[in-house]
Amino acid sequence: MGLGLRKVGKAVLVICAGLLLTACAEDFGPDQHGRKVTADSLDGQWLIINYWAEWCAPCRTEIPELNALEETLKNQSARVIGVNFDALQGDDLKRAADSFDIRFTVLAQDPAERYDLPRSEALPVTYIIDDKGKVREQLMGEQTLEGLQAKIKALKGA
C-alpha cells in the first residue's frame, strides 16, 4: 500500500508542477471579445502596439488606419495590438472598442512591462516591437496606414 501511495504522490507532484509552470506564463488577460491572450501567442511576431482612449479625438480618427494595417499584415508574422489608456476591462473594454469599431485585438492588461515601454501621457502613441521583442520605434500622434507601412518596411530592412 505504501508503494501505491508514493506513486500517487509522485503523480500529484508532477501534475502540480505542470500547473504551476502553466500559471507562470505571462497573461494579458482576455481581449475585448473575452479570448485569453498570452505573451507566448505574441512572441516571434512584429507588434504594432497602439495606446488609445475614448476621450482622445486623434485616436478615433486613427483607428480606421490601424484596422487597415491589421488587415494588410495578415500572414506576415505581424499584428496590431491595442491597449486602452484608461485600463478598461471586461464589458467596458468591449463597449469602448466597439464604439471605435476596433477590429484588432485589444489587450485587457498593459504589456508595457514585458516590452519595457515608456509611459506616455500624450495620445495616441504607437510602438513598433520587432520579432525579438525589442522596441524599435515610438511614434507620437496620429498615424496613417501608409506611414506605418513605410516605417515597418524600413525597420525590417526590406
PLM ranges: what are they?
Residues 2-13:
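Bacterial N-terminal signal peptides that target proteins for export
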